């Protein structure tokens, strides 16, 4: 009986060695196989540069809306430029083209006539992404007020890519800056963008549900501001 077990053990060891040797032999005989690359999201907008204008990036840049007509009407253009610029200045914001350390940046200015002004700024520096949220205690249609909320955090690559997809769906870089609206009260949804030396801004008043509104709402959700905000105040 012991001899039988001994023979079986020897046979098993011999078989195992043979299989291992064969596997190693064929492993070294195999040609190198190129593995498929991991799929990554191409975040360059398909509609870029679209209607954007070339603006030199410089810390000396002082105009928030350079070379951009916020309205075809001269009086409206001057009024809107002054209104929006005063709100941004109250938030200690700078023109996007003046931020030399940012490779790509976007700013959403949310001005509700009777509610607190909000600015959400997101940007990319290399492979890192960031968000800054500012809210004042005044009213978007009147005096800006002073800081009520101010915080910053990093954004994950997934969060950044999700926002890029929202901009892609709305064809942000191809959207006209102005769209005539007959509203007297409401909210201005102003989205600025700067990348590769080009600048674009879109201004809509209480936009209808759709891709552009979704892009703004995405930033508002990421900011956390909607968590304790009544639905009637979101317009």
Segments (PLM) and residue ranges:
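Function-determining sites in protein domains
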Residues: 20-235
């Amino acid at each position: 009986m012991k001899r039988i077990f001994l023979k079986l053990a020897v046979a098993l060891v011999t078989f195992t060695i043979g299989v291992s040797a064969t596997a190693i032999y064929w492993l070294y005989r195999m040609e190198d196989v190129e593995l498929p690359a991991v799929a990554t999201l191409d975040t360059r907008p398909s509609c870029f540069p679209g209607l954007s204008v070339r603006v030199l990036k410089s810390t000396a840049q002082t105009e928030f809306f350079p070379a951009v007509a916020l309205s075809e009407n001269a009086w409206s253009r001057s009024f809107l430029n002054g209104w929006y610029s005063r709100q941004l200045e109250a938030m200690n914001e700078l023109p996007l083209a003046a931020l030399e350390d940012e490779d790509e940046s976007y700013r959403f200015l949310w001005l509700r006539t009777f509610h607190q002004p909000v600015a959400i700024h997101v940007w990319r520096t290399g492979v890192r992404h960031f968000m800054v949220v500012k809210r004042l205690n005044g009213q978007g249609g009147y005096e800006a007020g002073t800081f009520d909320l101010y915080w910053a955090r990093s954004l994950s690559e997934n969060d950044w890519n999700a926002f890029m997809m929202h901009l892609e769906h709305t064809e942000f870089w191809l959207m006209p800056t102005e769209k005539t609206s007959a509203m007297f009260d409401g909210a201005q949804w102003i989205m600025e963008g700067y990348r590769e030396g080009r600048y674009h801004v879109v201004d809509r008043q209480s936009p209808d549900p759709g891709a552009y509104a979704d892009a703004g709402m995405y930033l508002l959700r990421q900011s956390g501001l909607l968590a304790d905000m009544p639905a009637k105040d979101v317009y």
